[in-house]
Amino acid sequence: MRTGEVAEAVPRVVAILSSLLQRVAERNDAAAAAAAVGEEAAAVSAFQGLTKPAISIGGYLERIFRFANCSPSCYVVAYIYLDRFLRRRPALAVDSFNVHRLLITSVLTAVKFVDDICYNNAYFARVGGISLMEMNYLEVDFLFGIAFDLNVTPAAFASYCAVLQSEMTYLEQPPAVDLPRLHCCPSDQDDAGCHHKQQQQQQQQQQHQLAV
């Protein structure tokens, strides 16, 4: 991919996901500061950093896109995996100290499951600005965190696409009340919990819109 084409080639899902995670991280940063639990939160997970990375969430996602060559679907699947991980670890809140590591690890996991061709962990470690040892450790911790539940049904994919589309609406016209949660369905593994209208035809339409 040529450098001059990167800005136009970045899929919409990257900007939408970065906006969603930015709001969630800022809200949790404020909550942690108000509760004065910074030191306690740092010990919750291996994903927790000691300092906030200088690069923004949006810049970090664009860097991943630029160098990892992920398909747009990977970012939706990474979002699903991240939600599954957080459901199983309710004590962990996405904030500015852990969101970058969570992102690079969830995208790495999604790429390996979704795309036919992907770079190895050493490459992703360089893209993410961490060591190979840390990348390997985070990947294993993440996989155990989601109980190796990597399968994503069409209904679940469509449901999370719908959430990202809602975020796109938020960007265009912010609602009076901020969207409070990162995830959408009570259980994305339960097809009965996802509406039939979000089946394969809608999935194809949503995937096209997010890739534009």
Curated annotation (Swiss-Prot):
Highest taxon in the source lineage: Eukaryota
Presence of the UniProt keyword Iron in the record: no
Alphabetical keyword list: Cell cycle, Cell division, Cyclin
GO BP of this protein: cell division
Pfam families: Cyclin
GO molecular function, one term: protein kinase binding
Entry keyword annotation includes Cell division: yes
InterPro entries assigned: Cyclin-like_sf (IPR036915), Cyclin_P/U (IPR012389), Cyclin_PHO80-like (IPR013922)
Family: Belongs to the cyclin family. Cyclin U/P subfamily.
PANTHER family hit by this protein: CYCLIN-P4-1 (PTHR15615:SF91), PTHR15615
Protein name per its UniProtKB record: Cyclin-P4-1
Record gene name: CYCP4-1
